């Protein structure tokens, strides 16, 4: 059971927004204060069939409407334990609430037939936040009951406890804030799930804690009179019993280093998809469950937490009217070739998901200097929320640009002018004034009388006075369609025009020594007024997109 899509109207800053979800895991990203955590809060109220306070209404005079598309069962043989004759696999429901209502109303979205609120409670929702003490809300009696059950299970399935592990758990009990049973439960789970091989490692405290949180919530559901567990359990054609569970995690990056962030989120997915045999055996023995059927929602501001698949990403953004909308990776429809490039380049563009605009450049030298150029021309990238991406070649720019545009991220791209005929009709593209970056730089510096400054940059880059070789000049002249015989090799500072301009020598050296370190030196050395106009134009265009949103 999972949510396939949701339309939210009149809730907080969601005037009218539609979202499509991945059945397994969804990562919500976007700017601060755009509604990501508010969405998780809405899930909690919705699954509990509670009314929302007046402050949550976008317009208190209008009702809040939430239209849900739910995938209930996997086949005609499946059913809910308390409704064996009902084999409905999918349904669309609408939850409505007015500010004056005591409780919300539930309707079949296709027939408008009013449904009992108990129907929405088939959704079991569990939330975790790194900034709240969720574990403290659980009564100590619950952990003590779990400790008893887990200790018996551990004693019958595991070997004797080594002395170092006994000392470690005693230390946790002595210095911890919770009842001792809480730490005992973590300890037992670490052994049951075979995660105590490094008794002081993070996996003992955090990965086992993830399992404890799920076990605790299942225990509370199994012992609750509000919603009987049988109301939620799905029985398949083989008689196996599964508990549908939606879990949300808000800001997992707090207190966790990048590897542990990913490890924790991956482990939650393993639990929800029954990929841990020991955990499944524990569910079977303690609760009579053969597994879970879960969907994960993660709100994060950390690129380290994000999965490397665009299909699991849901980005919230503001349109040209300032309204919050959603770009959902699960709903993208792309060709096979484009999809290959989307997956291949996605790790490079994660940071752009949080940006207000993006600049795409062809190579390493541009990548090394553009952020420094931005500071020089008065458009600091971090302040404006501008992300700079190295496409590693002209052919990749269009593909990465397409991916970013799918997520409704404003993009400008800088191409070398030698490909202008191919790309000039595309939206949001800019071109160098000369045939490439190196020509613009060398021409601009020499035209402004900054030859000495360019010599200093090259001297720092190579540790000696710059020299052009025959191969450098041959390569450059081939690019420029000039005769290399007109440009004898030698020290740059001695270069003089013979049958061609001096900038060709500097172009030849720069063209043969591309790299991010050279780019960094160029960015650090050029002052305002020295940055080539073509580069200023693209930076200012990105700055404008970052301040005046135009989706």
Question: What is the meaning of each model-derived region?
Answer:
Residues 28, 126-128, 297, 314, ...:
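Hydrophobic/aromatic beta-strand patches that form the interior of the parallel beta-sheet core
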Residues 345-360, 364-551:
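Acidic, Mg2+-coordinating catalytic modules of nucleic-acid enzymes
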Residues 29, 38-87:
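Conserved P-loop NTP-binding catalytic core
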Residues 62-68, 88-93, 120-126, 243-244, ...:
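Short glycine-/polar-rich loops that comprise or flank the Walker A/P-loop
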Residues 1-48, 200-348, 545:
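Switch/communication elements of ASCE P-loop NTPase nucleotide-binding domains
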């Amino acid at each position: 059971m999972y949510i396939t899509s949701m339309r939210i109207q009149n809730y907080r800053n969601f005037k009218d927004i539609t979202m499509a979800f991945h059945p397994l895991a969804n990562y919500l990203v976007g700017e601060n204060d755009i509604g990501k955590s508010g969405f998780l809060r809405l899930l909690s109220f919705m699954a509990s069939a509670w009314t929302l306070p007046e402050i949550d209404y976008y317009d208190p005079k209008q009702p809040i409407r939430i239209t849900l598309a739910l995938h209930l069962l996997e086949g005609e043989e499946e059913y809910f334990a308390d409704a064996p004759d009902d084999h409905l696999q999918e349904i669309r429901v609408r939850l409505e609430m007015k500010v004056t209502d005591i409780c919300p109303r539930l309707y079949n979205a296709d027939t408008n037939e009013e449904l009992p609120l108990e129907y929405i409670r088939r959704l079991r929702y569990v939330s975790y936040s790194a900034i709240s003490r969720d574990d403290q809300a659980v009564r100590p009696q619950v952990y003590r009951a779990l400790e008893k059950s887990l200790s018996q299970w551990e004693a019958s399935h595991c070997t004797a406890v080594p002395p170092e592990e006994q000392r470690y758990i005693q230390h946790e009990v002595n210095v911890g804030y919770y009842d001792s049973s809480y730490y005992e439960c973590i300890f037992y789970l670490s052994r049951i799930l075979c995660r105590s091989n490094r008794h002081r490692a993070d996996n003992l405290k955090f990965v086992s804690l993830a399992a404890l949180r799920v076990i605790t919530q299942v225990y509370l559901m199994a012992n609750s009179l509000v919603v009987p567990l049988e109301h939620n359990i799905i029985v398949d054609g083989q008689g196996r019993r599964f508990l549908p569970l939606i879990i949300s995690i808000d800001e997992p990056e707090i207190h966790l280093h990048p590897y542990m962030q990913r490890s924790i989120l991956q482990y939650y997915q393993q639990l929800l998809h029954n990929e841990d045999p020991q955990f499944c055996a524990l569910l079977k023995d303690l609760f009579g469950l053969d597994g879970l059927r879960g969907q994960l929602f993660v709100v994060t501001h950390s690129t380290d937490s994000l999965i490397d698949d665009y299909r699991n990403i849901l980005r919230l953004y503001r349109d040209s009217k300032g309204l919050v909308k959603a770009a959902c990776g699960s709903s993208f429809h792309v060709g096979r070739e484009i999809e290959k490039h989307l997956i291949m380049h996605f790790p490079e563009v994660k940071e752009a998901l949080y940006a207000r605009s993006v600049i795409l450049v062809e190579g390493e030298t541009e990548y090394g200097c553009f952020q420094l150029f931005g500071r020089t021309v008065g458009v600091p990238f971090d302040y404006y929320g501008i992300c700079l991406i190295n496409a590693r070649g002209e052919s990749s720019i269009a593909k990465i640009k397409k991916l970013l545009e799918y997520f409704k991220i404003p993009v400008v791209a800088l191409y070398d002018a030698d490909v202008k005929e191919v790309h000039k009709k595309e939206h949001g593209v800019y071109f160098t004034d000369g045939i490439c970056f190196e020509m613009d730089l060398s021409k601009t510096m020499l035209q402004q009388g900054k030859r000495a400054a360019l010599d200093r940059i090259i001297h720092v880059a190579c540790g000696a006075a710059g020299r052009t070789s025959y191969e450098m000049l041959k390569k450059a002249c081939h690019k420029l369609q000039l005769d290399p015989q007109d440009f004898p090799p030698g020290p740059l500072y001695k270069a003089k025009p013979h049958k061609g301009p001096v900038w060709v020598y500097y172009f030849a050296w720069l063209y043969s020594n591309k790299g991010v370190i050279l780019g960094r030196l160029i960015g650090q050395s050029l002052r305002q007024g020295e940055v080539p106009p073509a580069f200023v134009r693209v930076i200012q265009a990105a700055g404008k997109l970052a301040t005046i949103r135009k989706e």
